[in-house]
Amino acid sequence: MKRLRLAFADSPRGPWRDVSEPFTGDWVEGPSVARIGPEWLIYFDHYTQPQHYGAVRTTDWRTFEDITAQLSFPADHRHGTVVKISEELARRLQARRPAPTSR
């Protein structure tokens, strides 16, 4: 089972300490982290049935709240990341977005 855990170190190379218990369900991978105000959001791919993109949030890196139900992602979204852009660029990108197609 793949689950996300957290560990601490003074160097990116370790040594590691304070390894957490898993803070996601089973069978997740591809995490991406974004800071939004005082909160940190960790997005991940849940790749067994039902497949979906999930997320948890934390402010202290010790406790995590599952916020998957509060978010929406495009169908079949996998292994993404978050990039900060200006509101102007967001408007321009949305204006150029193609119409959805059915499968």
Model-found features: residue ranges?
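Carbohydrate-active catalytic/glycan-binding domains of CAZyme proteins
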Residues: M1-R103
